[in-house]
Amino acid sequence: MIETLLQSPSSWTNFFIFFGLAVLLLFAVLGFVTYGILAERKVMGFMQGRIGPNQVGGRFGLLQTVADVLKLLLKEDSIPKAADKPLFILAPVIAFAPAFMVLAVIPFTDKFQFADIGVGLLYYIAVSGITTIGVVTGGWASNNKYSLLGGMRAAAQMISYEIPLVMSVIGVVLLAGSLNLNEIVAAQEKVWYIFAQPIGFVIFLIAAVAELNRTPFDLPEAESELVSGYHTEYSGFRWAFFMLSEYVYFFGMSSLITVLFLGGWNPVMFLGFIPGAVWFALKFSSVVFLLIWFRVTFPRIRGDQLMEFGWKILLPIALANIFLTALIKELFF
């Protein structure tokens, strides 16, 4: 349907159809993220020997995140007197918008994708980098030393780990021969790339956690060091924008890992009778659980260790993986 609309001539009818689809995607993602956050809190509670949210919405706390969202929306919108007001207001939007833009190219099944473009992987990597600008802008505009330090840390961390992240997927691109995410999934029909590219998978997973600013790489918003990092001065719905962008990216990155290394919607061996959407959901949930497990298990590392690990360990290994993949492809394929 969407491909047909893209090829059809411009008209107000098509505009309103696209606008309606965009609003539908927005609410679908927000609803998913709302209960994704609840699921993370329940899993973390289980791992730490706690019950987790259980007061709002019955014994399972099903409406806890909804109540949190309403609380944030009803809070006063305060802007510090010394802040750069235009940039302070703009920063959450800059951080929030790309998170939804990248979801457009993720193929959830062979028939469900909002935009099937030839360079979907390149688009995802390029657009996701815009978030760094929003984070740094928020830290600078707050006119607060903790916010500024958090913004600087975020910029250094994201730039440092963006390089091994990109280099780790070059092996996948070499094997698939395409930047189109649908074609990458199709190329994994027989062998998933987690087996063909184990080194690339490990590098991508580590770099993805660093890109998401999640434990053990959550230095930009280290509560024990920087109060709340780059969003120290933010409250209410503006703070919610930063949090939403973080969680939308979290689920977006989990989807990308599923597509690049776990075969997307491709079934396991003789279980092809199970729908592709179910396979995608199972693989996606496994990646999400793994990242939550990381958050509960690992302590935060120091800033110097973070930089050293990225530049001295991940980068050379990622480069070696590219040469090894190219050599194997040239000799055996």
Curated annotation (Swiss-Prot):
It is an enzyme of class 7 (translocase). The chain crosses the membrane at residues 15-35, 88-108, 117-137, 159-179, 191-211, 239-259, 272-294, 313-333. It is a multi-pass membrane protein. It comes from the Bacteria. The keyword Nuclease does not apply. The keyword NAD applies. InterPro entries: NADH_UbQ_OxRdtase_su1/FPO, NADH_UbQ_OxRdtase_su1_CS. Signal peptide: none annotated. Its EC number is 7.1.1.-. PROSITE patterns: COMPLEX1_ND1_2. It catalyses: a quinone + NADH + 5 H(+)(in) = a quinol + NAD(+) + 4 H(+)(out). GO terms for cellular component: plasma membrane. It is found in: Cell membrane. Keywords: Cell membrane, Membrane, NAD, Quinone, Translocase, Transmembrane, Transmembrane helix, Ubiquinone. GO terms for biological process: aerobic respiration. Its main location: membrane. GO terms for molecular function: NADH dehydrogenase activity; oxidoreductase activity, acting on NAD(P)H, quinone or similar compound as acceptor; quinone binding. HAMAP family: NDH1_NuoH. NDH-1 shuttles electrons from NADH, via FMN and iron-sulfur (Fe-S) centers, to quinones in the respiratory chain. The immediate electron acceptor for the enzyme in this species is believed to be ubiquinone. Couples the redox reaction to proton translocation (for every two electrons transferred, four hydrogen ions are translocated across the cytoplasmic membrane), and thus conserves the redox energy in a proton gradient. This subunit may bind ubiquinone. Belongs to the complex I subunit 1 family. NDH-1 is composed of 14 different subunits. Subunits NuoA, H, J, K, L, M, N constitute the membrane sector of the complex. This is NADH-quinone oxidoreductase subunit H. It comes from Bacillus mycoides (strain KBAB4) (Bacillus weihenstephanensis).
